[in-house]
């Protein structure tokens, strides 16, 4: 949130033979000051920073916000197509992305708020399953942090959660809840739309 959750993955990834780097980020409302952190990664890897593109997609952070219903999610994805196509064109042509918004709010949310938010709110201890869990292991497979294991055929969360919500939003039986905060909320996961 306001700094992408897989920061360590990106900063540790080797980019062999690359000279330039573009960052394409999706979000439910805004990416905050993520461009600053992307620029830092580019500098750290001795790459020419070509900018950060923001693609608005359906919200999936149901520990705090509401995800849209399926039809509304489809509209949001459809509305993102022009921004996606512009992004593709800029990369194909080797052009930098236009500068992203960088105001006081963005710097505040990505700066002092972000570490406090992660320290006190981004915890896995509120995740739980109900009796509809079928022990399929989808949550284990979908976790980018390898933070979930099946114990006695039920998911157990470790301490490396980034709140990506893949476990809760991809659960085929909607058996996972984040305390009471997610109860009754629609789950969002990407649904491929037919492109023109």
PLM region spans:
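Iron-sulfur cluster-binding cysteine motifs and their immediate structural context
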Residues: 129, 138-156, 162, 166-183
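Short, flexible loop segments at the rims of nucleotide/cofactor-binding pockets, characterized by
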Residues: 1-2, 146
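FMN-binding flavodoxin-like domain, especially the glycine-rich phosphate-binding loop
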Residues: 2-116
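A mid-sequence, solvent-exposed acidic-amphipathic segment
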Residues: 103-136, 141
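Generic structural signal for beta-strand residues in well-ordered domains
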Residues: 14-15, 120, 141, 169
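Active-site-proximal loop/hinge segments that shape catalytic or ion-binding/gating pockets
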Residues: 188-195
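Residue-level preference for short coil/turn positions at secondary-structure junctions
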Residues: 17-18, 123, 129, 157
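Short loop or secondary-structure boundary microenvironments that flank
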Residues: 27-28, 133, 161
């Amino acid at each position: 949130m306001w700094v992408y959750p897989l920061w360590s993955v990106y900063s540790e990834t080797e980019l062999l033979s690359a000279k330039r780097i573009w960052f394409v980020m999706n979000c439910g409302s805004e990416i905050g000051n993520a461009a600053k952190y992307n620029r830092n990664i580019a500098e750290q890897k001795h790459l020419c920073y070509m900018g950060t593109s923001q693609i608005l997609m359906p919200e999936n952070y149901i520990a705090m916000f509401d995800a849209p219903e399926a039809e509304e999610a489809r509209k949001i994805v459809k509305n993102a197509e022009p921004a996606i196509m512009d992004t593709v064109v800029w990369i194909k042509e080797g052009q930098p992305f236009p500068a992203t918004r960088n105001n006081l709010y963005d710097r505040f949310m990505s700066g002092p708020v972000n570490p406090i938010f992660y320290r006190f709110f981004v915890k896995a201890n509120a995740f739980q399953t109900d009796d509809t869990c079928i022990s399929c292991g989808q949550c284990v497979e979908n976790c980018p942090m390898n933070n979930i294991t099946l114990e006695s055929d039920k998911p157990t969360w470790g301490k490396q959660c980034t709140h990506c919500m893949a476990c809760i939003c991809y659960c085929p039986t909607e058996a996972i809840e984040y305390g009471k905060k997610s109860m009754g909320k629609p789950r969002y996961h990407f649904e491929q739309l037919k492109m023109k």
